[in-house]
UniProtKB/Swiss-Prot annotation:
Keywords: Hydrolase, Nuclease, Toxin-antitoxin system. The keyword DNA damage does not apply. PANTHER family: RNASE YUTE-RELATED, UPF0331 PROTEIN YUTE. Belongs to the HepT RNase toxin family. It comes from Bacillus subtilis (strain 168). Its EC number is 3.1.-.-. Probable toxic component of a putative type VII toxin-antitoxin (TA) system, probably an RNase. Probably neutralized by cognate antitoxin YutD. A motif (RX(4)HXY motif) lies at residues 96-103. The active site is at residue 96. GO terms for molecular function: RNA nuclease activity. It comes from the Bacteria. This is Putative RNase YutE. GO terms for cellular component: toxin-antitoxin complex. Homodimer, probably forms a complex with cognate antitoxin YutD.
Amino acid sequence: MYFVDRSKIEKTLGFFEHQLALFDSQTDWQSEIGELALQRIGHLLIECILDTGNDMIDGFIMRDPGSYDDIMDILVDEKVVTEKEGDELKKLIAYRKTLVQQYLLADSGELYRLIKAHQTALQDFPKRIRSYLETELGPVSAFK
């Protein structure tokens, strides 16, 4: 029996999609506020990927991850995301350390290019999660 909190995962995915929409709606990140907003959006996208990955791993009793990269490796191994998507998302996840621990070194231009370069994988991530949930658990029901 799986203990997957679909409601929590769906809230996280909705928040993720909102952050991605905010990224897409902005055309100028050059101001100081713009750069800080971009860094926050990038950080939140990464956290949503990791939180959703951990929720999937815990809920479906997959093997325990040993690192952030390993979360993506497990999602690839379990066929939640494709290998290409996993590799692309890992490139963005690798920037987490800079955003969280080495924030003085954060380069908004580099982060912008990373998000743009892997935007398809980012857009597909919620679809892949939802598809896997429906395949494994069936359609969402109004009853809990």
